[in-house]
C-alpha cells in the first residue's frame, strides 16, 4: 500500500507516518511493519467492518442515472501511457515488473485503468453494453487516432500529459467525439470537443473565494501572503476590499489585526515552509490570548493549497484547532465504501487516488453519454455530479476555444482531526 491508501485508512498523513516510523522517510518497503496509533486503528476497524458503506456505485447520482439510457452508449476509448510498446517477447514478465517499478508514469496508468475496469464492470451490471478500446499512448499517436475504434468512439479518455493530450485533441476534430483530459489541467487546448476534467488552479481559487464571500462576508478577513505571492495577494484584496493585510509576521502583527467580537478568517498564501510554519504557530498561540474574558475565533484558510501544507514541520493538531479550510479537486474517502471494498477484494490493496479517479471519471462520462449519446448536448441537461472523490460540473469556455472546463471543486475543513466537506 502507498501513503495515500494508509491516509485513507487511518487518517494519518505521510508526515505523520514518517514521524511514527522514521525508517519510512525514504518510502514504504514491502513487508515492512508500520506503527499506527491504536486510536486511529480502532477508528478504521470500526468504520471498515461495522458501518454501512457510504457509497453505492450502482445507485449514485439518481438524477443522472434516470436520464441515462444504455442504448445511447456504443463505443469509448482509452489512450493511456502504459509504456509497454517497446517491451519485447523475451522475459516479458520481468520486463513488465521492472517497468512498473522503475517508471513513474506506468503505475499511474495501470492504477487509473484498474479503477476504470471496476466502473466498466459496474456499468455492465447496470445494463450498459458497449465496445471499449484501449491504446498505449507511447505508440504512434497519429496512427492511434486514425484507428477506426477511436474514430467511432463517442468518448476518448486520455492521454495524461498536456503535450500528448493536445496532440490527440488536434487530431480528433469530430464534434461527436468528446476528448477528455483525465489528469492535466494546465495549457489544455480547449477545442469544442475537449473536456478538461480536472479543475484548474484558477477555478479552485474562484470557488474558494465564492465560498468565503457567501459564508464569511460579515466577518474579519485578514490577508497574509509572502513576497512570491503578491499577485494572489492583490487578487484577494480585490475580492475582499475590507480585509486587513498583515505585513508584520509577529504576535503583535496578528494581535492588531484580530477582532474579538467576530470570526477571523486568515487567508494564508505561501509555498515557503518557514513562512507557513511560523504563521500557523503564531495563529495557534493567538487562540490562547484572552481579551475581556474572550478568546478569538480564528479560521485559517487558503485559496490555493500547495504541497507545503503536507510538510512534517506542520502540526495537524494546530491546523485542526484553526479549522484549516481549503479547496481541493478530490476529497478523501475512508476506504469503507463499497467501491474500495470491491477494489481491495479484486486487487488485494485499497485503491489510490488514480484508481479512484479512473473509476469516477469513467462512471460519470458513460452515464452522461447515456443521456443523449453526445456529451456536448448533455451538459445543458445535467449539472453537477459527485462520485467517490471527484465532482464534475462542466462549463463551456468560449474564450479559450469553446471546450469545457470542470468547475467541480470541494471545499474541505479540518475539524477534530478529520477532514470534512463543507461545500
Where are the regions that the model predicts?
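Extracytosolic ligand-binding ectodomains
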Residues: 1-11, 15, 19-423
Amino acid at each position: 500500500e502507498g501513503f495515500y491508501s494508509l491516509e485513507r485508512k487511518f487518517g494519518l498523513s505521510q508526515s505523520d507516518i514518517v514521524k511514527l516510523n522514521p525508517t519510512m522517510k525514504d518510502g514504504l518497503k514491502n513487508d515492512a511493519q508500520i506503527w499506527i496509533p491504536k486510536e486511529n486503528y480502532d477508528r478504521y476497524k470500526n468504520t471498515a467492518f461495522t458501518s454501512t458503506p457510504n457509497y453505492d456505485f450502482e445507485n449514485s447520482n439518481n438524477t443522472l442515472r434516470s436520464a441515462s439510457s444504455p442504448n445511447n452508449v456504443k463505443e469509448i476509448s482509452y489512450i493511456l501511457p502504459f509504456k509497454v510498446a517497446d517491451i519485447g517477447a523475451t522475459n516479458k514478465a520481468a520486463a513488465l515488473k521492472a517497468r512498473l517499478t522503475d517508471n513513474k508514469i506506468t503505475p499511474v496508468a495501470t492504477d487509473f485503468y484498474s479503477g476504470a475496469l471496476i466502473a466498466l464492470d459496474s456499468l455492465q451490471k447496470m445494463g450498459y453494453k458497449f465496445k471499449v478500446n484501449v491504446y498505449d499512448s507511447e505508440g504512434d499517436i497519429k496512427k492511434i487516432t486514425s484507428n477506426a475504434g477511436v474514430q467511432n468512439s463517442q468518448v476518448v479518455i486520455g492521454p495524461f500529459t498536456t503535450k500528448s493530450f493536445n496532440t490527440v485533441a488536434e487530431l480528433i476534430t469530430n464534434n461527436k467525439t468528446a476528448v477528455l483530459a483525465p489528469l492535466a489541467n494546465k495549457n489544455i487546448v480547449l477545442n469544442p470537443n475537449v473536456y478538461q476534467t480536472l479543475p484548474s488552479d484558477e477555478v479552485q481559487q474562484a470557488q474558494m473565494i465564492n465560498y468565503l464571500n457567501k459564508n464569511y462576508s460579515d466577518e474579519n478577513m485578514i490577508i497574509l501572503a509572502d513576497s512570491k505571492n503578491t499577485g494572489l495577494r492583490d487578487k484577494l484584496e480585490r475580492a475582499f476590499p475590507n480585509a486587513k493585510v498583515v505585513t508584520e509576521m509577529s504576535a503583535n502583527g496578528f494581535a492588531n489585526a484580530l477582532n474579538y467580537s467576530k470570526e477571523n478568517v486568515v487567508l494564508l498564501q505561501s509555498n515557503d515552509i518557514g513562512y507557513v510554519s511560523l504563521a500557523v504557530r503564531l495563529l495557534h498561540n493567538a487562540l490562547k490570548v484572552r481579551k475581556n474574558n474572550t478568546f478569538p475565533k480564528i479560521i485559517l484558510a487558503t485559496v490555493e493549497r500547495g504541497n507545503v501544507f503536507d510538510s512534517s514541520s506542520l502540526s495537524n493538531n494546530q491546523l485542526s484547532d484553526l479549522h484549516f479550510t481549503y479547496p481541493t479537486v478530490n476529497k478523501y474517502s475512508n476506504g469503507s465504501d463499497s467501491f474500495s471494498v470491491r477494489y481491495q477484494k479484486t486487487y488485494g490493496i485499497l485503491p489510490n487516488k488514480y484508481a479512484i479517479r479512473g473509476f469516477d471519471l469513467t462512471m460519470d462520462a458513460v452515464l452522461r453519454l447515456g443521456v443523449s449519446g453526445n456529451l456536448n448536448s448533455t451538459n445543458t441537461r445535467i449539472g453537477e455530479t459527485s462520485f467517490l472523490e471527484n465532482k464534475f460540473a462542466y462549463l463551456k469556455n468560449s474564450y479559450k476555444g469553446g471546450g469545457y472546463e470542470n468547475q467541480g471543486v470541494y471545499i474541505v475543513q479540518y475539524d477534530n482531526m478529520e477532514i470534512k466537506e463543507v461545500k
